[in-house]
């Protein structure tokens, strides 16, 4: 099933929905970072959440950064997403892996930890970015995001995120949804949706059966006048470049850069998001020193 993200409404706009299949996207992120199974599930859930949330941005220049740091062996997960549905991200410890939880599922909460915060940073080109922050609720990520929306944005929400890791460590299925009740929505409608969400199979199970994201949402919102508003293809895409990495190297400061130059060695930097290595020769480090720090 090809990746697809859709925006929709139900019950005459009382409910706002963003849903997506993200199997290929998550596969690419997990491949780039060579993740162990539990780390793959954690990174995949965050990538899916980022793709969903990024599409709420108003401008193509805006960015949304999602961070969760709970003190666990995952050492945090960071995602950056954009309005067109493309995302990039990394997990601090890609080898993080522990025994399944009591339900026999990959223990994402166990590697994330619960002693920390979930941050949502929206950079809309203003002087300061908007930063929303809540304590980690469960460490399972979906429930933490629902808690964030309810507490920080006063929008009652249900967030479902799923990643099914196959025996060969590839991603068999991945996807998710954000369902939000709009101001003035019928409380009984919210109760009905909550009941349905408890009764349906997991999103990874539905994707594995070959259901499209539209069919999954039609199944959840049967008899609720679901209307698909738009669809896009989400993807994992890193926009790193030699120029950006050069600026990052220059930003460490003249003193530290001079120390690197004086060692007479080449300097290698890796992109956090895609692991691509950029090598700067001794002469190139000297050029950076001259270009950024020589007195004009």
Swiss-Prot record:
It comes from the Bacteria. It holds the Pfam family HSP33. It comes from Clostridium botulinum (strain Hall / ATCC 3502 / NCTC 13319 / Type A). GO terms for biological process: protein refolding. Redox regulated molecular chaperone. Protects both thermally unfolding and oxidatively damaged proteins from irreversible aggregation. Plays an important role in the bacterial defense system toward oxidative stress. HAMAP family: HslO (MF_00117). Keywords: Chaperone, Cytoplasm, Disulfide bond, Redox-active center, Zinc. InterPro entries: Heat_shock_Hsp33 (IPR000397), Heat_shock_Hsp33_C (IPR016154), Heat_shock_Hsp33_N (IPR016153). This is 33 kDa chaperonin. Belongs to the HSP33 family. It is found in: Cytoplasm. The lineage of its organism: Bacteria, Bacillati, Bacillota, Clostridia, Eubacteriales.
């Amino acid at each position: 099933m090809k990746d697809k993200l859709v925006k929709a409404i139900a019950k005459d706009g009382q409910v706002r929905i963003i849903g997506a299949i993200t199997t290929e996207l998550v596969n690419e992120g997990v491949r780039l970072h060579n993740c162990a199974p539990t780390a793959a599930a954690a990174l995949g859930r965050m990538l899916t959440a980022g793709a969903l949330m990024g599409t709420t941005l108003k401008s193509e220049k805006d960015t949304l950064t999602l961070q969760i740091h709970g003190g666990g062996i995952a050492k945090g997960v960071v995602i950056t997403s954009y309005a067109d549905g493309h995302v990039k991200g990394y997990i601090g410890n890609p080898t993080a892996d522990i025994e399944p939880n009591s339900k026999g599922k990959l223990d994402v909460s166990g590697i994330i930890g619960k002693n920390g915060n979930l941050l949502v940073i929206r950079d809309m080109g203003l002087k300061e970015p908007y930063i929303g922050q809540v304590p980690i609720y469960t460490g399972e990520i979906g429930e933490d995001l629902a808690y964030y929306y309810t507490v920080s944005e006063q929008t009652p929400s249900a967030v479902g995120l799923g990643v099914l890791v196959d025996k060969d460590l590839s991603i068999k299925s991945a996807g998710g949804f954000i369902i939000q009740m709009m101001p003035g929505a019928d409380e009984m409608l919210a109760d009905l949706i909550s009941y349905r969400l408890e009764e349906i199979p997991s999103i990874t199970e539905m994707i594995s059966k070959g259901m499209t994201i539209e069919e999954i949402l039609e199944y959840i919102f049967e008899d609720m006048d679901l209307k698909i508003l738009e669809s896009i293809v989400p993807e994992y895409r890193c926009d790193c470049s030699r120029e950006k990495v050069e600026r990052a190297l220059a930003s460490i400061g003249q003193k530290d850069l001079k120390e690197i130059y004086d060692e007479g060695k080449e300097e290698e930097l890796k992109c956090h998001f895609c692991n691509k290595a950029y090598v700067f020769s001794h002469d190139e480090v000297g050029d950076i020193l001259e270009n950024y720090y020589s007195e004009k």
